[in-house]
Design a protein with these regions (language model features):
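Conserved small/polar residues in nucleotide/adenosyl-binding loops
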Residues: 161-168
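A structured beta-alpha segment of the ubiquitous adenosine-cofactor-binding alpha/beta core
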Residues: 68-125
């Protein structure tokens, strides 16, 4: 990815993880004018849950410093909601539904949050950047081929990312 591509506004960025550190990253990227989608597990565990977008998994939405993350149903739930059976047409219809739901949340100035622990949806969205902010001590499925730029945050992200950032907590960061 060239410097001009990185500098442009409105990049589509997927952040794997929505814990307290990931929330800070998401918040800053959103304020910089980028479209950010957060991916989280079914039962997230964050150190500081009251300042974490992962709370949206439990409450449907979470607001941190004026920015709201909104939980969207998983793709399978979208198929159930629309009453469509498991056919190729159903998959296309549910993907259109998912894209329109995500676009509606983004247009509202919020962050869509999807439950996708394996990152399967990343290939569907074809983001400009993937940020692995899961903060696990091992790789949980992120690969360098997921986007033109893949950034790892925390331990264990050296071999599968273009860039790596060390995490630090505190208000002087």
């Amino acid at each position: 990815m060239s410097n001009n591509q990185i500098k442009k506004k409105n990049l589509l960025i997927i952040c794997r993880g929505a814990g307290d550190l990931a929330t800070g990253i998401i918040h800053r990227l959103h304020r910089a004018g980028h479209r950010v989608i957060a991916l989280e597990t079914d039962y997230p565990a964050a150190i500081r849950r009251q300042v974490s977008f992962c709370e949206a998994v439990y409450d449907g939405s979470a607001t941190v410093e004026g920015l709201t993350a909104r939980l969207l149903p998983a793709l399978n739930d979208a198929e159930t909601i629309s009453g469509i059976n498991d056919t190729p047409q159903a998959h296309i219809a549910s993907q259109k539904w998912k894209n329109s739901a995500i676009e509606a949340v983004l247009e509202a100035g919020e962050v869509p949050l999807l439950i996708d622990p394996t990152g399967e949806s990343i290939a569907l969205f074809r983001p400009d950047v993937v940020v692995d902010a899961i903060i696990a001590k091992k790789n949980l499925g992120t690969t360098i081929n997921m986007a033109p730029l893949v950034i790892g945050v925390g331990p264990g992200s050296v071999s599968y990312t273009h860039l790596r950032a060390h995490e630090t907590r505190g208000n002087l960061v």
